[in-house]
Every structure is written in C-alpha cells, then in structure tokens.
C-alpha cells in the first residue's frame, strides 16, 4: 500500500485534493492511501515566508514529510488580480489580516476593485504542488493557472475563498457568466488551476510510482 500525506489544514482545499486523488491506484494495482494533518494529533503550521507559490508549497511539503517520515504533498495557491498589481497573490488566505474570514476577504477585494472597469478586471488562480520525500527533498513540483475575470458581486453557492467572484475564461461567455461557485465540482475540476495541477501530478505518479516510495 502506498501512503501520501496532504499538508493542508484547509478542509475545503483538502476535500478538492481528496476528490481528485481518491481511488487512485498505481500501475501495479497498489491503492493510494491518503493521510491528513488531522491524524497528527497536534497542530501543523508552517510559516509561509517565500515570495511565491512554489516556494511556500515546498516549505509545507518538506516540513510534513520530515515530521511524518513519509512522502508528503503540499498545495500553495491563490488569486492574482492584474489591476491590483498581482494582489492578493501569496497572501490570498490572509488578505486583510487575521480578523477576516473567506467572505470578509472577498468583500475587501471587491471593494478595492470598485473603480476598475469591466475590461480591466482580469485575474488568475495559481496552484503550485510540491511532492517531497521523507528527508524533505523535492521529488516533483508542478504549477498550473486558470485565467479569468472578476465580477462586481459574488454569486453561486459552491466553492470557497474567492470562487464566488471569479469567472474562468472558459465560462465567461455564459449568460450570466458562471463563477467557480456556480459550477459543480466535476465541472470546476476540468478548468481550475488545482484540477490541472493534480492531473499532471497523477500522470507523473502513474508513470513513476517510485515517487511515492518512503
């Protein structure tokens, strides 16, 4: 049996990762067993001090791999808005300070975009994934993006974070445009940054199962 630890305490992000990885088997039929930080019995927190998504994903994956003595996977992702010079970027999960929840961060972002015309509201989600071996060395790193636009008000009941105001370019022509929060999980996975990155990860693991060797 192959084991993989997921280095995230974000339950909604973790649910997406588990959905995309769930049921995976290696070429020899070996099932992949996923483990979460909840199993540690203690808080797992890593200071995200790197200036980019790749660096922060590496920090988290290496820390959990060394802590567990197993292979660990980390995802660092966020939203970059062109009119805000790339903000919130690596601060996406902490934008506006610790007093704000997901909804509060989204409201703040949309307030900052109030004067930005519709044609200038371009943005992209980025997902960087890093796989580290038990000694903390990087075994695989992938990064993917989803280009889109920011609406003026949130819509949709699904997703999390900035999903209710982000429309992927693939769904921008719909009337009305469909945000990530409007999409069912399977449809979102086909175009999202995380869906693209996880498919690349899965392909790599299927091609080389030694990446999961403890």
Each predicted region: which residue ranges?
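Anionic-ligand binding patches
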Residues: 2-5, 11-35, 39-214
